[in-house]
């Protein structure tokens, strides 16, 4: 997975004195100065491309979840949030790979799968067991932790909309990408409510 992340960022590895070694990540590559970015396993597209918008929004969600995780004190919830972050790296990797090159992701098990969807469903159900969710909209903002998670939820929803557009235009074929993001935003919503479970929900009447 680290190899995939480094390739997304155009990081470089090198050989030093005949031994395999990694240099410090090269942040400034200048390869994107013309407004394009490299995809995994080959190909370059404009940074304004719909595919880049999709995995860029995933990046926003991952970073937002990182802030939420830093605010959360409950170790179980922190672990769940980190699981979401790591899963979203896999989502980003698949979005950053053209369909003809997807087999290379499959070989390393770095594709979104039914098992990932099921895992998120199970995590959601486990948290819901301890909740009495209101049948109404909840106004975000009852705690810093839940507020951060709610921002993450909206970013995951935004990413889902971008991915739906890619799917409808046949740029991606894996429907589990859509299913995963839909479930992930559900999980984020439940996490937010779980964090505030000791307080009365601020419902929109």
Language-model features: locations:
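Phosphate/pyrophosphate-binding loop motifs in nucleotide- or prenyl diphosphate-using proteins
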Residues: 4, 11-205
């Amino acid at each position: 997975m680290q190899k995939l992340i480094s390739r997304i960022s155009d990081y470089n590895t090198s050989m030093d004195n005949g031994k395999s070694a990694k240099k410090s990540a090269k942040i400034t590559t200048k390869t994107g100065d013309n407004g394009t970015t490299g995809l995994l396993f080959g190909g370059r597209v404009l940074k304004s491309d719909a595919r880049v918008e999709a995995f860029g929004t995933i990046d926003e969600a991952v970073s937002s979840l990182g802030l939420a995780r830093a605010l959360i004190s409950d170790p179980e919830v922190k672990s769940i949030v980190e699981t979401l972050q790591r899963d979203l790296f896999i989502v980003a990797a698949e979005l950053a790979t053209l369909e003809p090159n997807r087999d290379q992701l499959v070989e390393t098990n770095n594709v979104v799968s039914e098992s990932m969807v099921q895992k998120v469903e199970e995590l959601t159900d486990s948290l819901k067991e301890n909740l009495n969710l209101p049948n109404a909209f909840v106004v975000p903002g009852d705690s810093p932790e839940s507020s951060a998670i709610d921002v993450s939820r909206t970013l995951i929803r935004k990413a889902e909309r971008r991915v739906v557009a890619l799917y409808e235009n046949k740029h991606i074929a894996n429907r589990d990408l859509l299913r995963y993001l839909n479930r992930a935003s559900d999980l984020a919503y439940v996490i937010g409510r779980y964090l505030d479970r000791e307080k009365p929900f601020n419902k929109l009447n």
